[in-house]
Amino acid sequence: MSNKNEALLRRKARVRRALKATANGRPRLSVFRSSKQIYVQVIDDAVGRTLAAASSLDKDLKASLKTGADKAAAEAVGKLVAERAKAAGVTKVVFDRSGYIFHGRVKALADAAREGGLDF
C-alpha cells in the first residue's frame, strides 16, 4: 500500500474514533469521494443500518450534472441527502469526512446539507 493511502486510512480511523466519542446516538453523515463521483450516506451505527443515501450517480441528478466530480455535483448531492434524511425523520447528524480534508467538494456537500436542513 502506498504511503498516501496509508495516511488516508490513519486519518479516517482517527476521525471515526473522535466521532464515536461525541456522537451521543446521532446518525453519521458519511462521505466517500472518488475521482469521478461523490457518495454520501446517513448511517445509524447503533443498528448498523443506512437511513438515507445519495450520490452523483442517482438518476435524479445524473442528467442535470456535467460531471459527478465537481463542487456543483457535491452541492446537489448534499441537498438530495438532506431531503431524504428529513423524509426518514433525521435532522441531527454528525459529519464523517472519512479522512478527507474539509475543503472543496467535501465542504460544498456539507454546506448544502446544512442548507437542506441537517444540523451538524
UniProtKB/Swiss-Prot annotation:
Coiled coil: none annotated. This is one of the proteins that bind and probably mediate the attachment of the 5S RNA into the large ribosomal subunit, where it forms part of the central protuberance. Keywords: Ribonucleoprotein, Ribosomal protein, RNA-binding, rRNA-binding. The lineage of its organism: Bacteria, Pseudomonadati, Pseudomonadota, Alphaproteobacteria, Hyphomicrobiales. Belongs to the universal ribosomal protein uL18 family. Part of the 50S ribosomal subunit; part of the 5S rRNA/L5/L18/L25 subcomplex. Contacts the 5S and 23S rRNAs. CDD domains: Ribosomal_L18_L5e (cd00432). It holds the Pfam family Ribosomal_L18p. GO terms for biological process: translation. One of its GO terms (cellular component) is cytosolic large ribosomal subunit. The keyword Membrane does not apply. The gene is rplR. One of its GO terms (molecular function) is 5S rRNA binding. This is Large ribosomal subunit protein uL18. InterPro entries: Ribosomal_uL18_bac-type (IPR004389), Ribosomal_uL18_bac/euk (IPR005484). NCBIfam families: L18_bact (TIGR00060).
